[in-house]
Amino acid sequence: KSKWGKLWGKAKGVAKKGAKKVKKALLKALKKKLAKEMAKSKGVDYKEMKAKVMAMDKAKVLQEAMKILGKKAMDKYLS
């Protein structure tokens, strides 16, 4: 599995009670993964970047993830 495939599996495993909870868990996991990727690419401390990403709203998180993942991958994981 790719790292994003593992992320999707983890989010589904965390919340098996309904679509809303799965999406919420996926967004939380996506924020953590996005913080790691952004910290790597910008050369910033992970904890600092995680704080910034966790403060972002859903639309901004998805926009940033789209830049890193690409539209095709985002459609796959958020459909």
From Swiss-Prot:
The keyword DNA repair does not apply. Keywords: Antibiotic, Antimicrobial, Secreted, Toxin. It is found in: Secreted. GO terms for cellular component: extracellular region. One of its GO terms (molecular function) is toxin activity. Expressed by the venom gland. GO terms for biological process: defense response to bacterium. Its main location: secreted. Insecticidal and antimicrobial peptide. Has insecticidal activity against larvae of flesh fly S.carnaria. Has antibacterial activity against Gram-positive bacterium B.subtilis B-501 (MIC=0.63 uM) and Gram-negative bacterium E.coli DH5alpha (MIC=2.5 uM). The mature peptide may form alpha-helices which disrupt target cell membranes. Belongs to the cationic peptide 06 (cytoinsectotoxin) family. This is Cytoinsectotoxin-3. It comes from Lachesana tarabaevi (Spider).
